[in-house]
Amino acid sequence: MDQLSYQSRLIPPEEAQQTGCFTSLPIRIHPRNDIADAATAKFIADWAKHVGDGREKRTHFCPSRVGNWNSLLYPEGLPERLGSVSYLLDLGLIHDDVNEELSVQDAMAAHERLRPALDPQDNRKWDPESPQMKFKMLLSECVIECIKTDRELGTAMLKSFRVLWLDIAENATSDAPQTMDDYWDVRMTNGGMSVFWPMVLYATNLRLSEEQHTLVQPIIAAAEEALCWANDYFSYEREVWELETGKAKRIVNIVEMVSRTKGLSSAEAKAEVKRMILGAEAKYCRLRDDLLSSNPEMSMDLKRWIEYIGLSISGNHYWLSACSRQNTWKTNCSIDGKINGLTNGSVNDTNNRSVDGVVNGTVDTGIEEPSTGNKDTSLKALKLLFNSTPNESHPVCRYPNDKLSDYAMVAPMTHISSLPSKGTRSELISALNVWLKVPPVVLGHISSAIDMLHNASLILDDIQDNSPLRRGVPAAHVVFGTAQSINSATFMFVKATEAVRSTLSPAALEALLRGLQTLFMGQSWDLYWKHNLQCPAEGDYIRMVDHKTGGMFVMLVQLMAAESPYYGASVIEDLERLMRLLGRFYQIRDDYMNFSAYSAQKGFAEDLDEGKFSFPVVCGFERDPELRGQILAIFRQRPTSGAGEATQLSRKVKEHLIRCIAASGGFDETLKCLRSLENELDTEIAELEKKLGQVNPLLRLCLATLSMEGCEKICW
């Protein structure tokens, strides 16, 4: 490993040994420990601001007298990435502290509350005061930073937090493990190892192939043993003390298991675990040396990765030996320094008890058995029905005025509502409310109305575009028929209007009606151009988008503004401008992505099937007259089904048109436009944050999830 260069400082062994550290591996510390400490300070302040439960005053975080945990775990990490991984690790510490005080079931619920904050694509609606929304506010800035810094590695790291940690952590049985294999299974689910390695890769900006990951996996396994055993070794006394004082519900520790299963005293069990730690480190070194000697042409990145694994082992060990997290409990011991429960060599898990979840008794189904009536009575009833005299009223006259079932009405609505959603609207509502502060109940009414309007417009759009798919699923009119779907969509507009009238202010109703007129006006021109095979000029297309797509976003702002007491007309005008820009970005992005892999959810280049003049086509027309002739000729001859509906163009025809658009520069101009709009949106958000005196991480997160940064250029 002499070929490698280091930015970190080597810790002298004699210095490390003063803390009780006994690792056999070299220890290094990041030169910018101040960045990691600053991230911890920010996390503590943010937790107090957004969560406010006082937990930040009781948790021991990453800083220590020998250095920040992150500076020792990622000594070769990029300085600009050290802050974000430090922030996330502090989150892990405070979250683990909470879970140690909970039962397994309650810990799982705590994981569930945190999960949405780590998912940039989460589009569920959360009450502003809910734990989920508090966590989203807490983590939005960090999530944005990770994605913007490195979309690939940042997204992978966040996904590992969400999927590999939250989704499986604490799902293990609460029974005390009896064998090493049992214990290792528990540690792999709640120890966070699956999350740690993506953090190292992100911090160090290393990208490895699947083959390289597989090659180094045995080394990773040895490292995980050393990391876990060291954590258990240095945390054992603290965990016992917390269990016996009621501060924790359970203990999961290899020292406890060795003591319990082998009948050893605590001191003997710790000595055994110490040998296990050194054995795991020796195994890492042996596997490392074997791999290097058998692969003399190994890439420098893979060599770095193997070295960084070892530095994580030693850095973790050193920090554990000195950090306040594992040592401050000592000040709470009894005067003679003894810890209750350590003398008999075992600690019982107070949470290891069975729960009788069976409720005795019968279940009433609510269904009665049919009675056996008299046949004669039934026959008399039939005779009365079919042999009635003219003086008797017909049964039709006697039918009660009962309401019809609403199944036929709501079925298309239910179908469209059940489909996967991009979640932009719900994310945008939460983001705008950071500034507008609409009360939660009122915000729920606005959100419900917007959802109905949006779903109604989707049903009509699919009908008007002859689109067979919506999010990869048959569109509503394909399942329920065009006429029924139109009827259902129209009813949704009426229902949304009634909901606004009955639950919101007159100003909100006025905003809704004005917004609906704008939406229909924009849609009319989109349909007109398609029907008349008339390609609009770029300016006309943007005005249509401002009415159709931007109109929905502007209407949302106006509805929220009507219910917000905080800001005047000038601020609302700024927000409306921001929404119009967002509408342009959103629609043009959708036009561009229709020609990319995203289109698989709707159908490959479906806009061409519909004869739609999307933005890339408009740009191509303005730059290449020859393209105009070819596209118009093909659109004019589009095949139709027996019902008069357009059918798909052949793939070869589509590929030809896409090559023409690419050759004309239509895709390049579209991508250039999108990047300019994204920068403009970022500037507008910054100006609003300055004007309103409040940053809006949720709005920036919303923009980051739509970002075109790193988007592949369409080339044919």
UniProtKB/Swiss-Prot annotation:
Keyword Metal-binding: yes
Binding site for Mg(2+) 1: 96
Single GO MF annotation: prenyltransferase activity
Protein family membership: In the N-terminal section; belongs to the terpene synthase family. In the C-terminal section; belongs to the FPP/GGPP synthase family.
Binding site for Mg(2+) 3: 461, 465
Residues given in the record as substrate binding sites: 96, 231
Protein name: Fusoxypene synthase
Catalytic activity: 4 isopentenyl diphosphate + dimethylallyl diphosphate = (2E,6E,10E,14E)-geranylfarnesyl diphosphate + 4 diphosphate; (2E,6E,10E,14E)-geranylfarnesyl diphosphate = fusoxypene A + diphosphate; (2E,6E,10E,14E)-geranylfarnesyl diphosphate = fusoxypene B + diphosphate; (2E,6E,10E,14E)-geranylfarnesyl diphosphate = fusoxypene C + diphosphate
Pfam families: polyprenyl_synt, Terpene_syn_C_2
GO biological process: alcohol biosynthetic process; isoprenoid biosynthetic process; mycotoxin biosynthetic process
